[in-house]
């Protein structure tokens, strides 16, 4: 039984020596695999992708240029300290060093082949659970690796949509690893590309990936956020905050202000921008202040017709959604979680800087502010 005590003992032991921790799913999976018929994919082309940090996406085609391919990805698990806010730090566990992990993009019917690396300097076992995958706990049962190990997982992308992936090493480790930064998104495009509500093809000029995450940083007796030297040192204090279900921070892309100022997203009038938004743990309500969702796949699944002209859409905890908007006016747009307390007080805000010419037909200041006259 994977108890909290076992988790703490394991975390402490890993600080000095590798410890093999396997879930029940991981133990059962190899036996099941041994009896499975082999699959020959040697005739399929291989495409190697270089992942990039969010909010950006790696090079990809919106419409598949050929039949199915094997998409090769590599991700390193990086444990490191990150700064959430001016006075708050997190001993983060990450995919490829970013919160969220990179956006992966393939086409329906393709294969995803991931090499997952847990470097020897890490202190924890990790794995990956793809919500887009079928079987073995989304791959979690086949990918649990200790520091100094790597594993290669291949799965077929059988469903089109945006899907969360996250670390799920078992028991109380699962939520702790997720709120410590270990989540991301994979987008599986239909082979013939996205379609609008009438089934007509649509394209985007830019895709931005916004990964929303909730964090639980404990405070000391003086009300100061605590800072730890490694993940396991802060485990017990962090879990105490997690159990309140009240986050200390709710942020986009790993930190308060990560997507504002120098990190603000950019577009031009006339650009069609696809916003992919994931939240592995809590519900969210994205809203583009000054704009709309022209086409919104609220559940993120592209074979369902998109909704149109939404002001605010809903992202269920543990899922990803997508919204397409054509910018019609220049200026600064705020993309927020429209629980405005979470946007303003917790940090769930991004900015989009749009260049272009103003259209007075859409909006005009008829009279500038003037003093009232008696």
UniProtKB/Swiss-Prot annotation:
Signal peptide: 1-31
Pfam name, any one: Cu-oxidase_3
Binding residues annotated for Cu cation 1, in chain numbering: 126, 167, 177, 182
Reactions the enzyme catalyzes: nitric oxide + Fe(III)-[cytochrome c] + H2O = Fe(II)-[cytochrome c] + nitrite + 2 H(+)
Sample GO molecular function, one term: copper ion binding
EC main group: oxidoreductase
Post-translational modification: Predicted to be exported by the Tat system. The position of the signal peptide cleavage has not been experimentally proven.
EC number in record: 1.7.2.1
Subcellular location as annotated: Periplasm
Domain of life of the source: Bacteria
Cofactor binding note from Swiss-Prot or TrEMBL: Binds 1 Cu(2+) ion. The Cu(2+) ion is held by residues from each of 2 monomers of the trimer. Nitrite is bound to the Cu(2+) ion site. Pseudoazurin is the physiological electron donor for the Cu-NIR in vitro.
Subunit-level organization: Homotrimer.
Protein name: Copper-containing nitrite reductase
Organism: Cereibacter sphaeroides (strain ATCC 17025 / ATH 2.4.3) (Rhodobacter sphaeroides)
């Amino acid at each position: 039984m994977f108890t909290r005590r076992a988790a703490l003992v394991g975390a402490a032991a890993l600080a000095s020596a590798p410890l093999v921790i396997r879930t029940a799913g991981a133990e059962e999976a190899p036996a099941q695999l041994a009896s499975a018929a082999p699959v020959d994919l040697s005739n399929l082309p291989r495409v190697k992708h270089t992942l990039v940090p969010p909010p950006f996406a790696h090079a990809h085609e919106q419409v598949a240029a050929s039949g199915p391919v094997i998409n090769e990805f590599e991700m390193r698990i990086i444990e490191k300290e990150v700064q959430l806010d001016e006075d708050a730090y997190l001993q983060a566990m990450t995919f490829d060093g970013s919160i969220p992990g990179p956006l992966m993009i393939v086409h329906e019917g393709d294969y995803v082949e991931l090499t997952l690396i847990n470097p020897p300097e890490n202190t924890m076992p990790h794995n990956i659970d793809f919500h887009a995958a079928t079987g073995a706990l989304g791959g979690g049962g086949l990918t649990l690796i200790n520091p100094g190990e790597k594993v290669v997982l291949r799965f077929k992308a059988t469903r089109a949509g945006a899907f969360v992936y996250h670390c799920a090493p078992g028991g109380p480790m699962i939520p702790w690893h997720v709120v410590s930064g270990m989540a991301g998104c994979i987008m599986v495009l239909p082979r013939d590309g996205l379609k609008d509500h009438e089934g007509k093809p649509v394209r985007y000029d830019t895709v931005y990936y916004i990964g929303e995450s909730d964090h639980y940083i404990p405070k000391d007796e003086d009300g100061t956020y605590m800072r730890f030297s490694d993940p396991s040192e802060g485990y017990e204090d962090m879990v105490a905050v997690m159990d309140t279900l009240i986050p200390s921070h709710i942020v986009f892309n790993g930190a308060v202000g990560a997507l504002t100022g120098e990190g603000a997203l950019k577009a031009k009038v006339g650009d069609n921008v696809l916003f992919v938004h994931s939240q592995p743990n809590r519900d969210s309500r994205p809203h583009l202040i000054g704009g709309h969702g022209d086409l919104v796949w609220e559940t993120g699944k592209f074979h369902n017709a998109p909704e149109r002209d939404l002001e605010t859409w809903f992202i269920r905890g543990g899922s990803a959604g997508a919204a397409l908007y054509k910018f019609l006016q220049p200026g600064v747009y705020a993309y927020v979680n429209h629980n405005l307390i979470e946007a303003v007080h917790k940090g769930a805000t991004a900015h989009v800087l749009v260049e272009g010419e103003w259209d007075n037909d859409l909006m005009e200041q008829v009279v500038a502010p003037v003093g009232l006259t008696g």
